[in-house]
Structures are given as C-alpha cells and as structure tokens.
C-alpha cells in the first residue's frame, strides 16, 4: 500500500522554519545540503524545507512523496487519469525515482526505496528508515 513519506515546502528561510518545527513539534534535523535546504523528520515523515530561489514564485507546498512497492503498477493506474508523468527524476535526486502530477497539477514523487535507499547511496544519511 502506498504511504506518504515526505513533504517538500518552499520557504524563505529554511533554517528558521527548521528551528520552528524542531522546537514546536520535536522534529530533528536529518540533513542540510549545499542548496540551503534543510530536512527535518519526526522519525517517519520527512519535511524538506526548500530555499525559495525563484523571484516572484510563491512559497508553500512544492510536492509530496509516496513510498510504493511497485512504481510500474502505480504508473499503469495513472494512465486512465490523463495526468503528467510519471517521469524519471534526475539521477542526483536519489530519494525518488519518478515524478508525476495529480489531476489538479500538484506534483508528487514515487519511490520504491525512498529515503532508506537514498541513505545507502550516500544521500539523506539521517533520514528515517522505511516502514
């Protein structure tokens, strides 16, 4: 059964927002990367706090990610919905293999290995293990 495993939020100050999530919700910082992004987790769901770099673009939800057992089966289900994707994610985005949109244009990722596979490949080292 697919499970939501991460959310990505575009924000003006990822460090300040990470501090908020850690102090208010007891989340833990699991990674910072060179793009000024901060990743926090409650041990199950990871929230990617992404630095806003595009002038005039809104902050808010960027995408959400599902961990799935069989991405090909999900891709087959998506065909009848006439949505964009799924398309392969760039190789430097090790935490998800595919990206698609829902019928209203909201982006979502599909990952068979999720953050656990990414940690094994050298990314998201502190992210929670998959369920």
Describe the function of each predicted region.
Residues 2, 8-47, 53:
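Core segments of cupin and vicinal oxygen chelate
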Residues 40-43, 100-103, 113:
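Active-site beta-strand termini and strand-to-loop segments that position acidic
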Residues 13-14, 64-107, 131:
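Vicinal oxygen chelate
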Residues 28, 48, 83-87:
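A short linear hydrophobic-aromatic micro-motif
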Residues 3, 34, 60, 94:
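Exposed loop/turn and edge beta-strand positions of beta-sandwich/beta-sheet ligand-binding modules
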């Amino acid at each position: 059964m697919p499970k939501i495993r991460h959310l990505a939020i575009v924000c003006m100050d990822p460090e300040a927002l990470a501090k908020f999530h850690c102090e208010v919700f007891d989340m833990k910082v699991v990674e910072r990367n060179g793009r000024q992004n901060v990743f926090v987790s409650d041990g199950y769901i990871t929230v990617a706090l992404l630095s806003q770099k595009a002038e005039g673009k809104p902050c808010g939800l960027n995408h959400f990610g599902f961990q799935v057992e069989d991405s090909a089966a999900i891709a087959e289900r998506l065909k009848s919905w006439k949505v964009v994707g799924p398309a392969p994610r760039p190789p430097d985005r090790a935490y998800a293999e595919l990206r698609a949109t829902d019928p209203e244009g909201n982006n979502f990722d599909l990952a068979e290995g999720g953050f656990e596979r990414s940690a094994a490949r050298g990314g998201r080292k502190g992210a929670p293990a998959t369920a």
